[in-house]
């Protein structure tokens, strides 16, 4: 009986000692980003949000998650969802306020990002961004510009004249 109790306490101690704090997880995610390990950085931030959702660093982690999805992974869907989560869970924080501004300006962001991707010869990603813009914001005032840019990409980058028209 004493052995079971001792083993249980030892196991609990090891689990507690091995788990990382919110500060450590934020630092790990930053290090992983510096080392271009974006998937591990995402896991670190998701762990922080799961284990410490009420921590003062949680809003920063949620916003940083959006930034990684949008800027490193070029994943508009996950990035937008992360921005929405930042607003819904941490709306009164600095990050929540900034996330709301970015949501409000998301169509402009998409168009600017598509132009940037094209200049960096990341044509496939630029096309994906423009298609997302056209599908999700069909009534937005910038959608015709997105359609024009998409046609221009097909015409000049892919030399696919039928698709461009």
Model region roles, listed by residue range:
Residues 1-2:
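N-terminal secretory signal peptides that target proteins for export/translocation
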Residues 5-6, 15-165:
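Acidic, polar-rich low-complexity tracts and alpha-helical solenoid repeat scaffolds
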């Amino acid at each position: 009986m004493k052995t079971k109790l001792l083993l249980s306490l030892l196991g609990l101690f090891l689990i507690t000692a091995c788990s990382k704090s919110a500060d450590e997880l934020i630092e790990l995610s930053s290090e992983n980003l510096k080392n271009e390990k974006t998937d591990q950085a995402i896991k670190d931030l998701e762990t922080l949000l799961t284990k410490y959702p009420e921590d003062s660093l949680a809003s920063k982690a949620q916003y940083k998650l959006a930034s990684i999805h949008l800027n490193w992974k070029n994943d508009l869907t996950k990035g937008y969802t992360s921005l929405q989560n930042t607003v819904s869970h941490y709306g009164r924080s600095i990050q929540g306020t900034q996330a709301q501004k970015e949501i409000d300006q998301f169509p402009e962001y998409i168009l600017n990002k598509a132009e940037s991707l094209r200049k960096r010869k990341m044509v496939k990603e630029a096309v994906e961004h423009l298609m997302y813009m056209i599908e999700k914001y069909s009534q937005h005032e910038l959608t015709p510009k997105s359609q024009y840019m998409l046609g221009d990409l097909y015409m000049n980058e892919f030399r696919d004249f039928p698709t461009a028209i």
